[in-house]
From Swiss-Prot:
GO terms for biological process: cytoplasmic translational termination. This is Ribosome-recycling factor. The keyword Protein biosynthesis applies. Pfam families: RRF. InterPro entries: Ribosome_recyc_fac, Ribosome_recyc_fac_dom, RRF_sf. It is found in: Cytoplasm. The keyword rRNA processing does not apply. The lineage of its organism: Bacteria, Pseudomonadati, Pseudomonadota, Gammaproteobacteria, Alteromonadales. Responsible for the release of ribosomes from messenger RNA at the termination of protein biosynthesis. May increase the efficiency of translation by recycling ribosomes from one round of translation to another. Belongs to the RRF family. Its main location: cytoplasm. Keywords: Cytoplasm, Protein biosynthesis. It comes from Shewanella baltica (strain OS185).
């Protein structure tokens, strides 16, 4: 019973780390990466659709993304969605393909992005700590139901804390790597 709780906590903490990593991938650095456009929704035949379902996003070079739209009639909608996003991008139309040059980041914009990334990391840490709290409360419920001993509870709390520390360390490593990536010119 306690093993299941610990295993579940570890899986959920891993998912928190993955979610944090995915959120940080959306933050624009100086380099072109297809995941920059993952959060963009396109109005396609009256329905909000993720960009990757109406177009293929690729990298032309380190500062240019190319978006090949599957349906030529959706080019204007895709272009409008990219321009109205908060990424500050201006696509250039070339037939069924949109080329998106990525402007160099200013120092001020880099610092703003670092604040965003740090906030995402803190949200990840909070989620991991919430999983820890849930796991420990589940173990304490077992103790109240006389399904385990006080020593088992203490041992479980220590193990869950080790999982928590390890996963928070992963989030911190991801944050450090992203900050370095953002500060590269």
């Amino acid at each position: 019973m306690i093993e299941n709780i610990k295993k579940d906590a570890q899986e959920r903490m891993g998912k928190c780390v993955d979610a944090t990593k995915n959120q940080m991938a959306k933050v624009r650095t100086g380099r072109a990466h297809p995941s920059l456009l993952d959060s963009i929704q396109v109005s396609y035949y009256g329905t909000m659709t993720p960009l990757n379902q109406v177009a293929n996003v690729g990298v032309e070079d380190s500062r240019t993304l190319s978006v090949t739209v599957f349906d030529r009639s959706a080019i204007q909608a895709v272009e409008k969605a990219i321009m109205s996003s908060d990424l500050g991008l201006n696509p250039m139309s070339a037939g069924a393909t949109l080329r998106i040059p990525l402007p160099a980041l200013t120092e001020e914009r880099r610092k703003d992005f670092i604040k965003v990334v740090r906030n995402e990391a803190e949200n990840g840490r909070i989620a991991i700590r919430n999983v820890r709290r849930d796991a420990i409360s589940e173990v304490k419920k077992l103790e109240k139901a006389k399904a385990c001993t006080e020593d088992d509870v203490r041992r479980s709390e220590e193990e869950v804390q080790k999982f928590t520390d390890a996963h928070i360390k992963k989030v911190d490593e991801i944050l450090a790597a992203k900050e370095i990536e953002l500060m590269e010119v």
